[in-house]
A protein has these predicted regions:
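Positively charged n-region of N-terminal signal peptides that target proteins for export
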Residues: 1-4
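C-terminal active-site subregion of NodB/CE4 polysaccharide deacetylases
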Residues: 21-101, 107-108, 161-261
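Bacterial N-terminal signal peptides
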Residues: 7-17
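Active-site glycine- and acidic-residue-rich loops that bind
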Residues: 132-138
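Short beta-strand and adjacent tight-turn residues that come in two discontinuous sequence segments
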Residues: 127, 157, 223-225
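Acidic (Asp/Glu)-rich catalytic clusters
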Residues: 114-122, 139-157, 216
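Proline-centered loop/turn at the N-terminus of a beta-strand
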Residues: 97, 123-125, 153, 221
Length: 261
């Protein structure tokens, strides 16, 4: 009986020690989430824009007002390495941290968001869809390199925005979704920036648990979704973001940043 009690105590102690380790999933889930904001197009609405599209298209004046609010309110932008270290080890962050992210390589992110962020010393994360590089209304490789050189982070957003939960492997690399959508775009961005690509965002923000072990094999430190609940087993691969909706007033945006995380 005594041996059983000792063995039980040892197991309980081991479980407590394991759960307290800074890098495990339980510890990561226990840390307070940091606000992460997602942008797509930054331009004024057009007559043909649908109601749904307007959620993803923030008018220029609204974008500028929202960034000014963040600066006036004392927010400090952080980059993914800082967020990763905080989640893994509890490393310190600046007061009122926030991350600004931009999806899909839209040219207005370079022409409008970049100079506006510079006014306040803000940095951002740009999730690049490599099929779009150099196309009309999208950034060029040179512009992506410039963003990287200026201290922003370049990250992957697949080749052409296909949903990750639909990917399949194939003996032919040209037909293997993981090669086409993950491996090749990552290498392309590393060639452009001269830096390792450690971060990824799901197209449409969509993911399903069965893909997470496979995605983990590709070495991304953090993967970003939208506002769905994080996966308790893979919190680093399901980091939450909120859209800064084109419909939102500055007050609504401020409240969402404060209360969504």
């Amino acid at each position: 009986m005594l041996k059983k009690l000792i063995a039980l105590n040892v197991l309980c102690f081991f479980a407590l020690v394991t759960s307290a380790q800074p890098g495990n999933s339980a510890a990561i889930m226990a840390r307070k989430q940091v606000p992460v904001v997602c942008y797509h197009q930054i331009r004024d609405w057009r007559p043909k824009d649908s109601k749904t599209a307007k959620d993803y298209i923030i008018p220029i004046a609204a974008f500028k007002q929202h960034l000014k609010m963040l600066a006036d309110s004392g927010y400090h932008t952080i980059l993914p390495d800082q967020l990763y270290n905080y989640l893994k080890t509890g490393a310190a962050l600046p007061s009122k941290p926030i991350m600004l992210t931009f999806d899909d390589t839209d040219l207005d992110q370079f022409e409008i968001a970049r100079p506006e962020m510079k006014k306040y010393g803000f940095k951002g994360v740009f999730f690049i869809m490599t099929v779009s590089l150099g196309r009309p209304h999208y950034m060029t490789k040179e512009q992506v390199k410039q963003l990287s050189d200026e201290g922003n982070v370049i990250a992957s957003h697949t080749w052409d925005h296909h949903r990750v939960d639909k990917y399949k492997h194939d003996a032919n690399p040209k037909k293997d979704d993981w090669v086409v959508q993950i491996e090749k775009p990552t290498k392309k961005l590393e060639e452009i920036t001269g830096k390792k690509i450690n971060y990824f965002a799901y197209p449409f923000g969509v993911w399903k648990k069965p893909v997470l072990p496979e995605l983990k094999k590709y070495g991304f430190k953090l993967v970003f979704q939208l506002a769905d609940k994080r996966d308790a087993d893979y919190p680093l691969l399901t980091v939450r973001r909120i859209l800064d909706s084109g419909y939102w007033t500055t007050k609504t945006f401020s409240n969402s940043v404060k209360h969504s995380f």
